[in-house]
Design a protein with these regions (language model features):
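Residues forming the flavin
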Residues: 1-344, 348-395
């Protein structure tokens, strides 16, 4: 029998057979012979002037409000950023009768390259390809303006969002021409996701830097095996590839592990082969999809000196520039001096920006170790949880 522990959080990871967790009733030490990490992802935070104004939502927050609470973000809306999720949420908001004025993406969506690539999506996965066409038709039928090769460069308002400025972009260069200005009440902005892989980092799994997002991915083979023995990783906690790849890789891992306890049957081998084919197909789908949504790399380019970079502790870009000096040349040193990254999110959002500013100041390369080091507890945890006697779980 499989024991399911709901609402249980892992706050410490010291070894694959030494994980610490808790829920409302118990404290646990988990000692696993095989560990599968599937901790998902979080949205990237690209700082933009006055992005702390009420009315500025992440795309994921807008989707959660709509799907979980049947509540659309209010008033006149613009969906902006980069990636297919933004197209999806724009269509979902329109179906919910929301007033979406424009869908803005930093990719050049209507390039000649994309005209040839788009039909490939339908060939690789007809179901997902048709779903994407449906989203696009929803925008066209509602006469929502589609603006490509553009980014939000400023949010404007007194105590709440009133306007958004949209500028053209190419090769990380923001156009100096007069930006488009929209009168809005809400903005959903999203520039993709970063893997939530703190457990894998603490366990010493090999990492690979994503040079576009400056987020680390967990190195793994085709079936999700990491560099650490008996540690596996699936889903967006490994790299951002979507639900279908998580599903099929999870199936491959399950079959692999079951084969260690019993002799594999013909049906197991057939199921493994089918899952491997589907995984390969969806990996190809993602590769083509992100070629279509390929956009200039953005980290701190949309912020000015007064922009808040660390939202948890209200640290501005100017504060960071002031303290990045000849003897403060690492993310850890900046963290200790400015407290950026010491808030509840533990640097998940500001770490890439701190790395970028250090790199620009010193001309130093960014690698897998440039960001903030993972710490225990992984996320804010009550001290009573850490001090309370533990109930051991062997799994």
């Amino acid at each position: 029998d499989v024991e399911i522990l709901t609402n249980t959080k892992i706050w410490g990871a010291f070894d694959p057979d030494h994980l610490l967790g808790y829920n409302d009733k118990n404290r646990y030490i988990f000692r696993a012979k095989q560990l599968i990490i599937a901790t998902g992802a979080y949205e990237r935070g690209i700082p933009i002037s006055d992005w702390t104004l009420p009315g500025v939502f992440t795309t994921g927050a807008a989707q959660t409000l709509l799907r979980s609470y049947q509540t659309a973000i209010p008033g006149k809306i613009i969906v902006s950023g980069n990636g297919p999720l933004n197209l999806q949420i724009a269509a979902e908001l329109l179906k919910a009768k929301a007033n979406v004025l424009a869908y803005v993406d930093s990719a050049n969506l209507f390039s000649i390259k994309n005209i040839f690539l788009s039909p490939l999506l339908g060939l690789i996965s007809p179901k997902l390809g048709l779903r994407g066409i449906g989203y696009l038709l929803t925008l066209l039928n509602n006469r929502t303006k589609i603006v490509s090769s553009s980014v939000p460069t400023a949010f404007i308002g007194n105590n709440k969002l009133d306007q958004i400025k949209i500028s053209r972009i190419s090769s990380r260069k923001i156009s100096s021409n007069e930006p488009l200005t929209y009168e809005v009440d809400s903005v959903a902005v999203g520039f993709g996701f970063a893997p939530s892989n703190e457990i894998a980092k603490l366990l010493g799994c090999k990492l690979v830097l994503d040079k576009k997002t400056l987020a680390n991915k967990v190195a793994n083979d085709f079936v999700g095996r990491t560099s650490r023995e008996n540690v596996w990783v699936i889903g967006d906690s490994a790299s951002i590839n979507g639900a279908q790849i998580a599903k099929y890789r999870g199936k491959l891992i399950a079959i692999k592990l079951l084969q260690e306890f019993k002799e594999s049957s013909l049906s197991d081998n057939i199921e493994f082969g089918i899952a491997a084919i589907n995984l390969t197909r969806h990996l190809l789908f993602q590769k083509v999809l992100w070629q279509i949504f390929k956009a200039p790399r953005l980290v701190a380019e949309l912020s000015d000196d007064e922009t808040i970079i660390c939202r948890c502790l209200n640290v501005s870009k100017k504060d960071l520039h002031t303290d990045i000096t000849y003897d403060v040349e690492s993310a850890g040193a900046v963290k200790r001096i400015t407290r950026a990254g010491m808030g509840k999110c533990q640097g998940r959002y500001c770490s890439p920006i701190v790395q970028e500013l250090i790199s620009l100041h010193f001309g130093s390369p960014i690698d897998e170790l440039s960001g903030f080091a993972p710490q225990v507890p992984i996320k804010p945890t009550p001290i009573s949880v850490i001090a309370y006697p533990t109930q051991r779980k062997n799994s």
